[in-house]
C-alpha cells in the first residue's frame, strides 16, 4: 500500500527534484501559469492511475498564499490609519468596560475586536462600498462578538453619540446599543443578525447567490457588489458554517468573500490545540472549490522566508501545533527563538541571521495592514469562484499579558489600570491618565488629519457603513381581493387540497403584471409532491449556468426546464439553504431596494423544528414573505409516520413575535389570508412574515360565506349553525380537523338534538396576541374604558361550553384559554405521530368527529345539562373506549 507523501519528507534525489522544478519554472516563464497548472493536473491524474492512495493538493505550506512581491501598495498614510485605529481600539474597549462598571451583569466582549480590528479597518478604509443614491453597496456579515469596534467607528463618524456608547447593552430606555448585530433593535444600522454562531456564514452564501439570481433575471445590476462574511475559526465548527460551501463554488460566486479570524481560540480554549485549524479549513474550502488565501505572517517574516530557500522554517512552522503557537504572540524573544530555530543546524543558522529586534517584530498577518490589503485586493479580484481569507490573529491583541492570547480572553470583561496603560502605550492612544481611569471616550479634533482621513475614505466608498434601508423607495401594487374571485367561489364540486389551492393562487399572482416578476417560489426538491411541476416550464427553474443537457422528460409538457433567467428556486434536499434563499429574498426590499415576494413551500415538519434559529433571525432581520408549511397536521399526512407528521409547527411559530400564523381549511380562507399578507407586507411595508399551513387532503371547498373576511384575518369566524333554539355548545376547529368538527356538529344534532355553532379558527395565535394586547392595555390604562379582545367579543353571546379540536398538540389551542370565560375543552394530537390511514389516526388521537361529539357531551355532562346515561349511550354509539391510554405516552 502506498504511503501518503509529506511535503517535508527527506529528498532522496535533490538533482531530480531540481530538474522537475526548473521545468515547471520554464513553462511558467515561456508559456504561462495556466499551462503549468494544466500539466500539474495531468501529472496528478497519471499518479492516481498508478494506484497511488495519498491525498494531494488540499493544503499548502504554512505560509502566506501571496508572496511578498505581490503586496499591493496601500494608497493611504499608514501613520494616520494607525492613529485612527488607536481611537477605535480605545473606544471599543472603553465601551465594554464602562458597561461592566455600571453593572457587571451586562457582559460584553473585548478580545474579539482586538483581534480583528486591523482587518475591519482596512475593509472600511478601502473595500466596503456603501449603498447610496448612485450605486448599491456591499453587504457585510460582521463577527458578532466584535461589534463594539463597529460602534466605535460610527461614533467617530458622528452617527452615534457618547450617550449611546455609554448605554452599550442598555436598550430599554431607548438610547442604548444592541449587544450584537440586530436589525430589529437598530433598524437603520445593522444589515444582518449574525448570532447565534453559524447563521452568518450560511446566510452570506445564499445572499451572494440571490444577488446573482437578481442579476441573471435582469432585475438589477449586482456586478460591482460583494458580500463579506467575517467569522471566527471556532464558529466554523457549526454545521451551518461549512455546510453550504459547495453551492458557492458550484455557482461561481466570485462576489462572496469569507474572512475567517483564526485567533485559534474559541470560548473556553484552543480551537484545535492538537492540530492546525488553518490547514484543516484550507483543505475543506479548497476541496469545496473555493479560492483560499492564507494570511498568516506579517511583513517582518518576509526576510526570513527569503533566506529559507530550502524550506526548513516552513517545515518547522507546519509542525508547530496551534496549542503551542497560541503562546507565540506574547512570547519573549528567547522563547520565540527556541520555538522557531531549535532542532537543526540549518534552523539555528537561519536564526543567527536576524537580530532580536527582528525576532520581536515577527507577528501575524491579520494585524498587518499591508498584508491584509493585498489579501483583500486579491479576494475581490478573483473570478469564477468564491474566496476565503484565513487570517492568523491573536485574541485580545494588545490588551496586555493577562488577556492577550490567553484562554480566558473571550470572557475577559475587565482590564486593570496597568493593562489599560499597556494598551495605550502599545497603540500610542492619545489619552491622559485621568481619561484612562475614567474610561472616557475620545475623538480626534474635527480639523485633524485623522478626522479628515476617516471622512475622506468613507466618502470615496459611498458613505457610512454598515447602514440599513428601512423600506424600498417604491412599494408594490398588490392585488385586491377581487383578483381571487375564482378561488373565493369554492371548488365547484371538485375535491382539492389547500396545497393545490395555493398553487392556483400562485398561478394567479404570476399573471399579475404588477408583481409577477417579483415572485420567488422556493421548493426543497418537493415540487412534484406539491403539484407545482407546472411551474417548471411556465417560469423555469433557476440555474446559474442554464441547462447544458437534454432532460429525460423534455418531450413532456411539464419537463424539468432549467434556465439562467428561471424564477423558481429548486433547492434540493436542503431546508436550511432553502430558508436562507427565502431570507435573502424576504429582505431584498432593504438590501437591494427591490421588494421581492418569496413563497417557500416545504414539509411543515421540516421547517421551524429544523431551522428554528434561522426563523428567529428572520424576525430579527425584519423579513417579509410567505412560509408555506405543506403536508401539515399530525394525522393528515397519514402514512409517513413519526418523523414526518407535524403536530407542533404552530407552537414554534407562535414564539416569533412578528411571524403571523394561520391554519386555514378552505381555499377562500387561504386567498383572504394571502391577499391580506401581500397588502400588509408589500403595500403597507409592515415588518412581518407569514406562516401558513396547508394540507394534502382532498375535499370540496365551499364559497366564502358573506361577511367572513374580517374574521378570517382576525383569527375566527362563525362558519355555520346547526340545530334550533339556544346554543348548547360552541365548536372550534381549524385546518384538517375543522371538517371533523362540522361532522361532529351534525352528529350532535341528529343523535342528541343538541344545537351548536361551528367556528373556523384560522389563527389561535393571532387571537391570543390580540387578547394579550387588550389585557396589557387595560392593565396600564386603568382609568380608560377597557378594551375587549376579538375572541371575547365574539363569544359574549354564549354561556355554554367551548370545545376546540385541532390536528396539533393541545398547547396550540390552549393559547386562548385565559381569554375564554366559558368552560373550555381542547382536543389535540399530543405524542409522537405514527403511520396509518387518516381515519384511524384521528380516532387514535381522539380528534375524529365521534370523539369531538363525545367530548362535547362530556362537557355538557360536567355542566349538569345532560345525565350520565347520555354519556354512556354516546360511548357505546361512537365506540369510545373508556380505558383508552393518553396518547402522549403511547
Residue positions per predicted region:
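Thiamine diphosphate
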Residues: 2, 14, 23, 170-193, ...
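Cofactor-binding active-site loop characterized by glycine-rich and histidine/acidic residues
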Residues: 73-102, 109-251, 274-275, 532-535, ...
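Non-catalytic terminal/interface segments that mediate subunit docking, oligomerization
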Residues: 66, 71-92, 113, 128-131, ...
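Glycine- and acidic
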Residues: 6, 23-26, 73-81, 99-108, ...
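N-terminal amphipathic, basic-rich helices that act as targeting or association modules
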Residues: 2-157, 423, 496-512, 516, ...
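Residue-level marker for buried hydrophobic side chains located in beta-strands
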Residues: 229-230, 258, 522, 628, ...
Amino acid at each position: 500500500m502506498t504511503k501518503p507523501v509529506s511535503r517535508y519528507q527527506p529528498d532522496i534525489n535533490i538533482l531530480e527534484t531540481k530538474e522537475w522544478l526548473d521545468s515547471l519554472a520554464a513553462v511558467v516563464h515561456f508559456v504561462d501559469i495556466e499551462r503549468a497548472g494544466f500539466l500539474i493536473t495531468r501529472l496528478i491524474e497519471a499518479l492516481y492511475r498508478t494506484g497511488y492512495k495519498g491525498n494531494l493538493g488540499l493544503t499548502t505550506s504554512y505560509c502566506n498564499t501571496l508572496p511578498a512581491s505581490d503586496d499591493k501598495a496601500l494608497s493611504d498614510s499608514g501613520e494616520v490609519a494607525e492613529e485612527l485605529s488607536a481611537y477605535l481600539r480605545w473606544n471599543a474597549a472603553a465601551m465594554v468596560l464602562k458597561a461592566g462598571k455600571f453593572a457587571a451583569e451586562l457582559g460584553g466582549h473585548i478580545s474579539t475586536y482586538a483581534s480583528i480590528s486591523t482587518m475591519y479597518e482596512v475593509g472600511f478604509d478601502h473595500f466596503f462600498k456603501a449603498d447610496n443614491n448612485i450605486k448599491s453597496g456591499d453587504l457585510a456579515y460582521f463577527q458578532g462578538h466584535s461589534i463594539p469596534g463597529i460602534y466605535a467607528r460610527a461614533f467617530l463618524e458622528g452617527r452615534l453619540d457618547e450617550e449611546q456608547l455609554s448605554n452599550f447593552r442598555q436598550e430599554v430606555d431607548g438610547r442604548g446599543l444592541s449587544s450584537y448585530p440586530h436589525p430589529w433593535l437598530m433598524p437603520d444600522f445593522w444589515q444582518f443578525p449574525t448570532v447565534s454562531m453559524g447563521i452568518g456564514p450560511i446566510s452570506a452564501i445564499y445572499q451572494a447567490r440571490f444577488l446573482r439570481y437578481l442579476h441573471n433575471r435582469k432585475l438589477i445590476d449586482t456586478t460591482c457588489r460583494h458580500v463579506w462574511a467575517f467569522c471566527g475559526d471556532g464558529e466554523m465548527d457549526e454545521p451551518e458554517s461549512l455546510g453550504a460551501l459547495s453551492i458557492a463554488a458550484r455557482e461561481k460566486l466570485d462576489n462572496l468573500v469569507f474572512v475567517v479570524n483564526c485567533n485559534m481560540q474559541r470560548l473556553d480554549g484552543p480551537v484545535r490545540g492538537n492540530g492546525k485549524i488553518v490547514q484543516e479549513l484550507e483543505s475543506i474550502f479548497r476541496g469545496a472549490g473555493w479560492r483560499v488565501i492564507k494570511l498568516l505572517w506579517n511583513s517582518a517574516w518576509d526576510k526570513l522566508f527569503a533566506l529559507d530557500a530550502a524550506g526548513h522554517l516552513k517545515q518547522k512552522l507546519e509542525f508547530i501545533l496551534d496549542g503551542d503557537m497560541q503562546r507565540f504572540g506574547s512570547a519573549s524573544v528567547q522563547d520565540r527563538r527556541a520555538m522557531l530555530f531549535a532542532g537543526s543546524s540549518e534552523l539555528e543558522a537561519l536564526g543567527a541571521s536576524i537580530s532580536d529586534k527582528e525576532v520581536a517584530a515577527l507577528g501575524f498577518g491579520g494585524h498587518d495592514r499591508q498584508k491584509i490589503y493585498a489579501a483583500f485586493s486579491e479576494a475581490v479580484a478573483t473570478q469564477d469562484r468564491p474566496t476565503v481569507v484565513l487570517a492568523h490573529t491573536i485574541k485580545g491583541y494588545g490588551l496586555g499579558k493577562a488577556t492577550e492570547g490567553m484562554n480566558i480572553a473571550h470572557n475577559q470583561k475587565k482590564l486593570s489600570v496597568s493593562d489599560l496603560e499597556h494598551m495605550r502605550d502599545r497603540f500610542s492612544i492619545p489619552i491622559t491618565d485621568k481619561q484612562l481611569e475614567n474610561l472616557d471616550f475620545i475623538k480626534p479634533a474635527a480639523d485633524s488629519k485623522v478626522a479628515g482621513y476617516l471622512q475622506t475614505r468613507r466618502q470615496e466608498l459611498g458613505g457610512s457603513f454598515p447602514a440599513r434601508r428601512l423600506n424600498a423607495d417604491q412599494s408594490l401594487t398588490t392585488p385586491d381581493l377581487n383578483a381571487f374571485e375564482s378561488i373565493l367561489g369554492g371548488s365547484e364540486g371538485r375535491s382539492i387540497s389547500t396545497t393545490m389551492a395555493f398553487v392556483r393562487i400562485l398561478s394567479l399572482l404570476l399573471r399579475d403584471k404588477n408583481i409577477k416578476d417579483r415572485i420567488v417560489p422556493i421548493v426543497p426538491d418537493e415540487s412534484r409532491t406539491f403539484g407545482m411541476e407546472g411551474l417548471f416550464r411556465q417560469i423555469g427553474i433557476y440555474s446559474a449556468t442554464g441547462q447544458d443537457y437534454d432532460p429525460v422528460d423534455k418531450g413532456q409538457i411539464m419537463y424539468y426546464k432549467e434556465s439562467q433567467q428561471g424564477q423558481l428556486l429548486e433547492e434540493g434536499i436542503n431546508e436550511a439553504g432553502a430558508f436562507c434563499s427565502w431570507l435573502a429574498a424576504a429582505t431584498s426590499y432593504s438590501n437591494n431596494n427591490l421588494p421581492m415576494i418569496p413563497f417557500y413551500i416545504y414539509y411543515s415538519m421540516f421547517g421551524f423544528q429544523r431551522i428554528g434559529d434561522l426563523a428567529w433571525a428572520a424576525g430579527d432581520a425584519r423579513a417579509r414573505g410567505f412560509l408555506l408549511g405543506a403536508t401539515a397536521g399530525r394525522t393528515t399526512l397519514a402514512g409517513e409516520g413519526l418523523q414526518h407528521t407535524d403536530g407542533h409547527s404552530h407552537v414554534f411559530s407562535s414564539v416569533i413575535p412578528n411571524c403571523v400564523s394561520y391554519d386555514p381549511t378552505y381555499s377562500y380562507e387561504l386567498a383572504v389570508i394571502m391577499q391580506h399578507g401581500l397588502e400588509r407586507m408589500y403595500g403597507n411595508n409592515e415588518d412581518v412574515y407569514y406562516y401558513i399551513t396547508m394540507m394534502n387532503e382532498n375535499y370540496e371547498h365551499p364559497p366564502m360565506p358573506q361577511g367572513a373576511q374580517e374574521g378570517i384575518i382576525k383569527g375566527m369566524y362563525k362558519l355555520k349553525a346547526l340545530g334550533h333554539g339556544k346554543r348548547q355548545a360552541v365548536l372550534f376547529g381549524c385546518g384538517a380537523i375543522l371538517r371533523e368538527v362540522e361532522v361532529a356538529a351534525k352528529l350532535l344534532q341528529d343523535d342528541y338534538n343538541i344545537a351548536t355553532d361551528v367556528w373556523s379558527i384560522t389563527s389561535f395565535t393571532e387571537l391570543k396576541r390580540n387578547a394579550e394586547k387588550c389585557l396589557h392595555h387595560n392593565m396600564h390604562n386603568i382609568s380608560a374604558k377597557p378594551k375587549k379582545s376579538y375572541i371575547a367579543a365574539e363569544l359574549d353571546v354564549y354561556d355554554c361550553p367551548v370545545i376546540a379540536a385541532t390536528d396539533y398538540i393541545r398547547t396550540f389551542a390552549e393559547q386562548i384559554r385565559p381569554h375564554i370565560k366559558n368552560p373550555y375543552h381542547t382536543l389535540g394530537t399530543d405524542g409522537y405521530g405514527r403511520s396509518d390511514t387518516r381515519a384511524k389516526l384521528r380516532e387514535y388521537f381522539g380528534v375524529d368527529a365521534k370523539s369531538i361529539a363525545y367530548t362535547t357531551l362530556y362537557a355538557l355532562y360536567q355542566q349538569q345539562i345532560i345525565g350520565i346515561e347520555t354519556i354512556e349511550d354516546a360511548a357505546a354509539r361512537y365506540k369510545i373506549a373508556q380505558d383508552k391510554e393518553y396518547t402522549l405516552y403511547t
